[in-house]
Amino acid sequence: MAKDNDNETRTALDEINESLTGLEQKVQNSQRTIMWVILAIGVVVCAILIWIYAIRRPGMAAADNAVGQADITLSTGNDSTALEQYRQVADNYGYSAGNRAALNAAILLYKDGKYEEAAKYLDKYDATESVIGAAAKSLQGDCYVNLDKLGEALGCYDKAIKISDENPLYTPYFMMKKATVLREQKNYSAEAAVYREIIKDYPMYGAQNGIEMEKYLKRAELQAEAGK
């Protein structure tokens, strides 16, 4: 009987030992997995740090220096040289400096009457502030008007209106541009609708800018009625 008990005890101990051995093996395997995960994370972190300190920061510094030089050139009145400098920054760099360079290049190109190229640089510009972003989109619309691409112009003015976020100074200004294009397209009913919206939402705009909004509206309504 004692021998049976001894055998049972040994069997139980063996089972425990086997369980412990299996558990130890699982722990070792888990430790290896964790080690490889940590190593992989370390490699990724190192790559990110290298990108930030060896590539991104020097790139940002170079872009800032280049656009700063273009700003100095522009301040001396040498627009053509400044334009080339802005174009180089916009074409070769990202970051905020490249973004601003794209906008400045577009403005100078527009002044030179190079509307198609100006519109392309405005496509590169990523607005970070509502008023400037809306003005940039409006300028792109002006480019398309000069290229007789009225549909594209309307799209730009609609975006400018949305981006300007009901700014009482700028939103109705962009709406007036939209109405002008609609008039050019002889879409008088849509033109009238824009004037009504300005009068309703920005009642002081006309008086503040010397624009007789009611007369503009009446004219559009009469022409819309005549065209039916």
Language model: regions and residue ranges:
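TPR-repeat structural position
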Residues: D79-S80, Y115, L150, Y188
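N-terminal positive-inside, membrane-proximal cytosolic segments immediately preceding the first
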Residues: A2-A40
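Short solvent-exposed coil/turn linkers within tandem alpha-helical repeat scaffolds
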Residues: R57, V89-G98, K124-A134, I161-T171, ...
